[in-house]
Amino acid sequence: MKIIIAGAGAVGTHLAKLLSREHQECTLMDADPSRLEGLDTDYDIMTMLGSPTSIKALQEAGTDEADLFVAVTPDESRNMNACILAHAIGAKKTVARIDNYEYLDTKLKPFFRKLGIDSLIYPEVLAAQDIINGLKMSWVRQRWDVHGGALVMLGVKLRETCEILNQPLKELCGPD
């Protein structure tokens, strides 16, 4: 999967590192060269110096072939504009980090999709969800929501003596 991340701050860099470990083709773009220093040598990612609202920079990054474009700079307007441009250039899916809670209203989803923004990330809501999930399931080490929460995958730690270790799920859950 070809992924372009605009914004090499804490969120963008962390995301790029995670995707690098999953062997995704990842390009991290930022207008500040100091934020990109060493990342391409320490991790399996490409770095690119450029503004996410520059059409030329987006084209050079290969946005027209991107499966996913994620804009996570600290500037909400820049993120939204970058996604609109990336969509127009040909990115298949776009995600913008936002600061305005109002934008998360489900009635606005079609509006943002028309603009070319497929998903919105609001960091405070994500953090709150993680805290709530942690309180509900303190025994869970990792949690992944797949397909918008339709499927939830959990990572748990088991003792070596646990009876379910090395058992196929089919046997644990039964035939249905």
Regions found by a protein language model. Name each.
Residues M1-D176:
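Cytosolic regulatory regions of ion transport systems
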